[in-house]
Amino acid sequence: MQTIFVMAKCALGQAYEVADAAIQEVEQVSEVHSVSGQYDLMMKCYLSDEADIGHFVTESVQTLPGIADTFTIIAFKAFS
């Protein structure tokens, strides 16, 4: 299982709609948080080991209405 975080900039006034769409339409998105800073949202996504991260981001996340820009972070290890 691969864990990635996708930071998203949204069109003005669209962050809540983008968050709702990400949770409802993209199966791999497990959490969406509104954040401060350069980006509006942070999405936590779980992908299969075989999944291509680039294709997932460009085809499933960047195509959501209201997404203006993304930045992807790949997690190496989760600590508990």
Regions found by a protein language model. Name each.
Residues 1-80:
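A compositional/biophysical signature of low hydrophobicity enriched in polar/charged and small residues
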